[in-house]
């Protein structure tokens, strides 16, 4: 899996914005990606050193539309802590 396939998009929420002050950045990642692949992708794309990676798996939720029932897509989020430096997400 290539680096651009691993990272989908940065997650910009109130909680993740507060974590950026501690050099922790949050990304939506591919559901098949592991911690090592996420670390290599962030280091390659943003040219920074990664300290550690935490991954959160979100299960699909049951949703209804009238009498029809289905599920939302499952999601995987990675929280990446940097050793030094920062990522400029707003350019």
Swiss-Prot record:
The answer, when asked if RNA-binding is one of the entry's keywords, is yes
- InterPro entries assigned: Nucleotide-bd_a/b_plait_sf (IPR012677), Ribosomal_uL23-like (IPR013025), Ribosomal_uL23/eL15/eS24_sf (IPR012678)
Gene encoding it?
rplW
Q: Please provide the Gene Ontology terms (biological process) for this protein.
A: translation
Record organism: Staphylococcus saprophyticus subsp. saprophyticus (strain ATCC 15305 / DSM 20229 / NCIMB 8711 / NCTC 7292 / S-41)
GO terms for molecular function, please?
rRNA binding; structural constituent of ribosome
Q: Which family does it belong to?
A: Belongs to the universal ribosomal protein uL23 family.
Presence of keyword Hydrolase: no
The UniProt entry's GO CC annotations, sorted and at most eight, read: ribonucleoprotein complex; ribosome
Print the keywords alphabetically.
Answer: Ribonucleoprotein, Ribosomal protein, RNA-binding, rRNA-binding
Protein role: One of the early assembly proteins it binds 23S rRNA. One of the proteins that surrounds the polypeptide exit tunnel on the outside of the ribosome. Forms the main docking site for trigger factor binding to the ribosome.
Q: Where are the transmembrane segments?
A: none
Q: How does it assemble?
A: Part of the 50S ribosomal subunit. Contacts protein L29, and trigger factor when it is bound to the ribosome.
Pfam families, alphabetized:
Ribosomal_L23
Q: What is this protein called?
A: Large ribosomal subunit protein uL23
């Amino acid at each position: 899996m290539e680096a651009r396939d691993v990272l989908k998009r940065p997650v910009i929420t109130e909680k993740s914005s507060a974590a950026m002050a501690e050099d922790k950045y949050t990304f939506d990642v591919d559901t098949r990606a592991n911690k090592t692949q996420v670390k290599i992708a962030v280091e390659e794309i943003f040219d920074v050193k990664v300290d550690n990676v935490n991954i959160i798996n979100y299960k699909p939720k049951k949703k209804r539309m009238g009498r029809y029932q289905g599920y939302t897509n499952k999601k995987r989020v990675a929280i990446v802590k940097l050793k030094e430096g920062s990522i400029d997400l707003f350019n």
